[in-house]
Every structure is written in C-alpha cells, then in structure tokens.
Amino acid sequence: MLYQLSYLAAKGIVSAGRLGASVAWRAMRKLSLLTLFMVALGTLAIAGCGGSGGGSDGSSPLDNALRYLPADSPFAVAIDTEVKGDQFEAAGDLSDKFALGDEVQKQLEDALGERAGDLKDIQKALGNEFVVGSTDAKSFVDSPGDEDTAFVGAIQVKDTDALGKLTDGGKAEEDGEVDGAKVYKDDSGDAFAIDGDVLVVAGSKQELEDALATRDGDDGLTEEDFDAGTEGVSQDALLRVYLNIGQLLRASPDAADALKSKWVAAVRTAGIALTFEPGEVAVDIDVVTDPEGLTDADLPIAAGADAPQVLDRDGGINLALRDPSQVIEFAQATAKTIDPESFASFEQDKAKIERELNVDLDTDLIDQLDGDLAVTIGLDGKFGARAELKDPAAFERTLTKLEKVVPNIAEGATGEKVGFVKPKPGEDFYAIATSGGDQIVFGVVKGVLVLANNAAIAGSLATDGTKTVSGAKGALVLNANAAKIARTALQQAAGQGFDLGDQLNGKKLDTGALGELIGSFEATTDGLSGSFTVTTDRK
C-alpha cells in the first residue's frame, strides 16, 4: 500500500490547472470605482444596516446585470447588496461578536483616501445584485492576476441620482457613447459606463464597449443560466459564484492530463454560495457532472449520503472517509489513463513484489480498507490515521511479508536513507525514521490499522472514541474546534512575525466567539456536493 500511495503521490494525478484568483479581486485592484462599491458593501455588512434606462429591460435586476457578460462566460459572481436584508443583518451581527466592526470599517474607509466621501452616495445606489464576471476562459486561466483585463462588472442601481454624483465635480469625464450608454473615464484613468440605471465597469475600454454591445444583443449570460449553474447551493446567499469548470479545464493547457480522467471529463459546472445565518457562516459547493456513462465506481469518493464518524479529539482537524479503497482505486484508474506507460512500469514493479513475497497487494492491502478511515491533523504538523480492516489478522500477516521491501519503498518516497524497526515481541508498531528526525509508526492495534508521525498519537489512536457530526452528508467529513484552530494559527503567525493586533491598531480578535467547523462532501454520478460551516457560540 505504501508503494502504491508513494507512486500516486509522486505522479500528482489530477492537475486541473490554475484557475486564477478571484475575478472580483482582480477587478477591485484595477478599478477605483469598483473598489468604492466593494468597500461600500463591506462597511454596510459590518454595520448590519443601510441607508428606466437602456439596461433595464431584463426580467430582473440580476438578469440585467448578467446580460453584460457573454453567454459563454466561464465565471460570474453575484453579490447581494440589499443592506436591509437578512444576509447583511446576520453579517453585521457576526462582526459585533468579534468586537472589530468599528476598526475594520475605519480601515476600509482609510483605504479609499479622498474617495471616502463618496461612500454615502454609493450606499444609496445599492440594493440589487452586483455582478462581476470573466469574459474569456483562456485569459482567466492563463493571465497573471494583474494582467487579466477580461472581466466586466455591472449593477442596476436603485438611486440614479446617487449614481450621477459619482461623475459630478470633475470626478469623471465623459468619453463618448456606446449603444446609448454614456462612457466615462475616472480620475484613475479607468473607463466605466452608465447605461440608464446600470453602472458597468470593465478591465479595459475595449472590454467595456464589448460588454455594452453584448447587452444590446441577445447573446448575453442570463439569470436562467446563472440559476441553473448554482441550483445546488443556497439561493438566498450573500454571494453566489457560477463556474463553467468544463470550459475552464478545456481552456487550460495544464488540464489536458486531468481531462483524460473519466470523472473529470464529465464535470460541467459548479456553484458556490456564501451564506450568513444567525449563529453560523456557511459555504455551499455543488459540482455538476454529466452522469451519462458514469458509474459509482468512477467517482473520486464513495457514493451515497451515509457519513462516517470522526475521531473525538480536540485541538486539531478531524477527518473521516468512508471506504478509502474507493479513493485509491480512483487514483490508480486516473493514473493509468493519464500516463499509461509509467503506470505499466508501476504495475510491473508491483507484480515483481507480489511474486517475490507471495502477496496480492490489491486483495491483501487495498481491499482490506473497506470500512472507515479516521484522521486527526494538528497545526503543529502531527497527525494520525486509523483505518478499519476487513480481516485484521490477515492484514498483520501481509505486513510481516512486506518487511523486506518497506525500507526500500520508504526510501523511494522520501529520497533519503531511512531506519526501519520491526515490532518486538508483544509490541504492535513498525517504525520508519529519517536522518532529519521525521518518523512514521504503523501497525495493527486492537483490530485497526494505525499510522502516525507521533508515538503518543499512535499509542492512543486505536482506543480513541468517535462521534457523529451533526448535519454531515457523504463519504468525506471534517470537524474541528474553530476557536482552538484560530487561536493556534494566530499564535503561529505571531511567531513568524505577523501580529494581527498590529493590523487592527492593537485590538485582539475574539476567537472565543467561534464554535465548530463542520464540513462534508457527498458524491453521486450527478455531481459532488458539499458544505463548510463555522458556528459561533454567542447567539
């Protein structure tokens, strides 16, 4: 098993390519007016409250904004700007729990400098969905963040008078007209347009003109398209993301190998949603696949909604995986498809080991892992894993047969000489150690396979209790104490010279307000759905 896993890890089986940073973030860095809009949203979210033109003939304000993007847009974000709505109220309540709202709002306003005075006008214009998206898949995956200009942002405003004030007093100068929309250039040299009651921004003047032409035609992205792509996530979210993953993968030369995988090639779109509720923040993810030709055996994790239990250990991140053999078999099938020549060599080496040691690595190792795998990971780098076995006694006999080759496999995986110690009579653990002090101990204890890089964790792992994670669905589950994780992360960052207090003018982040981090993923032939939720202890 170690041999197979080291091979698969070294191959880096699925490389989907760099999808790039957030388009919204790129846009903010390029366009001062868009930055102003985003900061206005930020200050209102912290506060938790808020104060017919050529582009207004769509079915809704969201539809109007989306139609400035091409129908084949690979990426679009819709941000709810209804500052008196439930999402902003919940976000404001959350900032109050950490007692940082005033300080963060001050820093956001300071970042605007001279344009901070425009905040009130912008906030009056908000209320509808603000859309930012990419116009070209190849540019999105290939261009560095600061060089990609292939994006467009739009919002149908509620107060056109407030929007008009952004161009008053020399803040922007007219720069022509396109398809009935007035084009302006702001004091940073960035182009934007006012199309009736819609504000349109873009990465370049050419992109802006193309967006206006797209809106004037019939080939724009629609609300129906966007809703279909985000159907599997919350529709009442503060932020929804639409991704045409299939298009992005096909546009990236780095993803050519990944697309050889049957499951990856079946991926079509994905939706992501960020939702604030009283007492929690949630991120929902839904990846849609074309089920034609797919079976449960083709999935990256085991199919079905049944969720495994996680280890009941505090202070670290606890993961659980139902039927880990499914992941290994998926990885092997993908490796064989991507690089058949290398995989054939791997199979030859595996067959040689099987002949010499009289074992069947698939039957005697991989097929044994048909129960649950539970893993605990600390932020200090210590980890442990416990796997249920079909036949523990048979697995122990297989480990005994593999004693001759384990050192060579470990040296191949680490690239250096290792020490290998077999268990003494009455003991359970094998040990592998490098000259640098790294170690792995493993063995069958009380009927389960235990593997860890720390002897203390290994000693307790077999008898540690487990617990059911509330709301978890699917073969992969995650659980952690969010407060302890945040505290440890901040302490480690401070030890490396980063002090969050310096960024917040001496104020401390109240991590005690955090509760649990819960995550899970469920796979079917129709797609992969999951969620991550952070609860807060203070209601």
What are these regions (language model features)?
Residues 184-252, 435-505:
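A conserved glycine-rich beta-strand in the N-terminal activation segment of trypsin-fold
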Residues 178-184, 424-432:
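Short, hydrophobic/aromatic-rich segments at coil-to-beta transitions
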